Amino acid sequence: MTASHHSKGRRHGHSRHGHGRTKSVLWRINWLFIILAAVASGLVAYFLLTYKILAGRGYHLWVLGGLGAVLLLLILLNGLKRLGKTTLVLATVVILGASYGAYQMNATVNFFNKLNTNTQKQELTMSLATLAEGGVADVSALDGKVVLAPLGQDRENVQALVDDLKAKRQVRVTVEEVPSYLAAYQQLLDGKAQAMVLNSGYESLLEGMASDFSSKIKKLYQYNHVTEVAAQPAKPEAANQQTSQTPAENQPFNLYISGIDTFGPVSSVSRSDVNVIATINPKTHQILLTTTPRDAYVPIADGGADQKDKLTHAGIYGVEASMHTLARLYDTPIDYYVRLNFTSFLNIIDTVGGIDVYNDQAFTSLYGKYDFPVGELHLNADQALGFVRERYSLSGGDNDRGKNHEKVITALIKKLGSRQTLLQAQEVMDRMSQSVQTNLPLAKVMELVNEQLESGQAYTVTSVALTGHGSTGLPSYAMPGAELYMMQVDETSLAERQAQIKQVLGQ
C-alpha cells in the first residue's frame, strides 16, 4: 500500500470523526432546546389550567395535547441523529410560540390584577382656599384663624386636612361649621372668613352653581387624601350593607357601570354622571342595560345618610355609595362594578379605531361643537365624548342623554369583542389599565368567555331607562339651599325596570 493510500485513509477517518463530533454537539444542543420548549410549554399549561383560559369546549386540552405531542416528537426526532437540524428548527418554533403565548396570558392576568388593585384606592384632594383677589397670600397667615367647612357632611376629610396642615406646616386653624360647601363659598365671598375648606369631589357641584367659581378662588394648601376601599356586592335590603357572596359559576349577575365626571385619575372621587346596571345572564345570553338618569331624586346611601338627592351626588361618597343606592332602588343585588372616567373614553375608543352608533335625533353638542345628523355615525373618542355629554340639545334632555350613554357603551362592548380588537389586545389593555377600575375578577371573565366558546350564541342586548318628571326646589343633602333640577322617579317606570331586571336574572 502506497503512502498516498495511507494519507487518504487518515483523511477519511478524520472526516468521519469530525462529522460524528458535529452530530454529537448538535444532539446536545437539541436536548437543551427540547428542555427549554418543555419549560415554555409548562408555563402555557400553568396559565391555561390555573385561570381556565380557553376552557370552553376543552380548547385548552387540545392546546396542551398538541404541545405534549410535539414535545414527544422532538424527543423521538432527536434520537434519529440524521434529523438533528429539523429537530432544532422545530424546537425553536415551539419555544418561540409557547413563550409568546405564556407572555400574552401573563399580561392578561397582570392587567386584571392591576384593575382590581385600582379598586382598592380612592383619592380626593382637600384644600384650603381663599379669594383670588384680596385673599391671604400664604397659608401661614391662617395660623390661629377661623376657616369654614361643612363638618356635618364631611367631618372625616376636613379633619384629615387640618391634621396634615398642623403636622407639615405647623399651622393651626379653627374650623367653623357651615351647612355646605356652597354656604362656605358664599360666606367667603361675603368676607365672613379668610378661607374655606374645599373637597375636590364637590368642586364640579360648585361650578354648576357658580360658573366663575374656579376663577374666584385660589388654593393655599392641598392634601391628597387616599383611602382604602374594598367594594363588595351590595344587598338590596340594606343600602349600607355588603355581602361577600358572589354569583355562582355561569349564574346571572348585575354589573354597575359608572362614568365619573372628571378628566383626572379614575381613582378620584367625583360625581357619577353615567349610571348603568348591566344585568347579564350567561345561560340565556341576555344583557339588559338599565340607565338611571343622573338627576333621579332618590335616597342616597352611605355618606348621603339615606337622604334624597340627585343620584349623581352619590359618586362623591364613593362607588360603594352608588352601588348601594341603586341596589336598594331596584331591589336587586349588584355584584360587580366597572368605573371609568371621560379620559377612558378618549383612550379606549381611539385605541379600537372608533365606534359606530345610530343617532335618532339631530343635534349639535356643546362640547366640541360637533354636528350629529340622524343616522349611522362613526365616532372617534372626542366625538363620542361630545355625544354622551350633551343633554340640553336633546328633546328628552337627560333621559335622551342616558340613551346615548347606552348606545356608546353597547358599541364599545361590540368593538372590544371584535377580531380586529383582539389582535391589538395588549395595547387596549395598557390603555384601559390606566383609566378603569373594576372588582370583576378574571375568573368571572373567563367564565363568560368559556361559556361563549361552548355555545357560540350571540348575546341579545336590550336597553331601557328609568323615567320621571322634572322638578326644581327639592332639598339636596349635598347642596342644601341650592335650587337644583331633579327628576322625580315615576313609580310605574320603576316597577317596570325592577321587573325587567328580575326577569333577566331568572327570578
Please name every model-derived segment.
Residues 83-106:
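Internal/C-terminal transmembrane anchor helices
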Residues 90-97, 137-140, 279-280:
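A short, flexible N-terminal coil/short beta segment enriched in small residues
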Residues 1-40:
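Membrane-anchoring/interfacial helices and their immediately flanking loops
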Residues 101-118:
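Hydrophobic alpha-helical transmembrane segments in integral membrane proteins
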